[in-house]
């Protein structure tokens, strides 16, 4: 425990919190342009072809973003909205594309969890 004199001389140092999503710059989402759309494989023990895209953001950052849901319509030069949120089995992927916003269409025939995949309520 520090004495009051010691604290007067040098105050306590605040711990600096490092952001998990630095490219968003404290914004909820950011817009960007796809520079490359491709598939990649997850790390062990999982096996799949995960759909990801490389995105150049409006603030100049270039990040890798995961495309969730079954099927997508993205290609090079598509304008997308990205949000934070990493993919645990893809190293270096710290962002998600927002489905149903800008050029990224929602998931077809999605019935459950629709809000996460940009799907409107079906006509009963």
Swiss-Prot record:
PROSITE patterns: RIBOSOMAL_S12. GO terms for cellular component: small ribosomal subunit. InterPro entries: NA-bd_OB-fold (IPR012340), Ribosomal_uS12 (IPR006032), Ribosomal_uS12_bac (IPR005679). Keywords: Methylation, Ribonucleoprotein, Ribosomal protein, RNA-binding, rRNA-binding, tRNA-binding. GO terms for biological process: translation. It comes from the Bacteria. The modification 3-methylthioaspartic acid is found at residue 89. It holds the Pfam family Ribosom_S12_S23. GO terms for molecular function: rRNA binding; structural constituent of ribosome; tRNA binding. PANTHER family: 30S RIBOSOMAL PROTEIN S12 FAMILY MEMBER. HAMAP family: Ribosomal_uS12_B. Part of the 30S ribosomal subunit. Contacts proteins S8 and S17. May interact with IF1 in the 30S initiation complex. Belongs to the universal ribosomal protein uS12 family. This is Small ribosomal subunit protein uS12. The gene is rpsL.
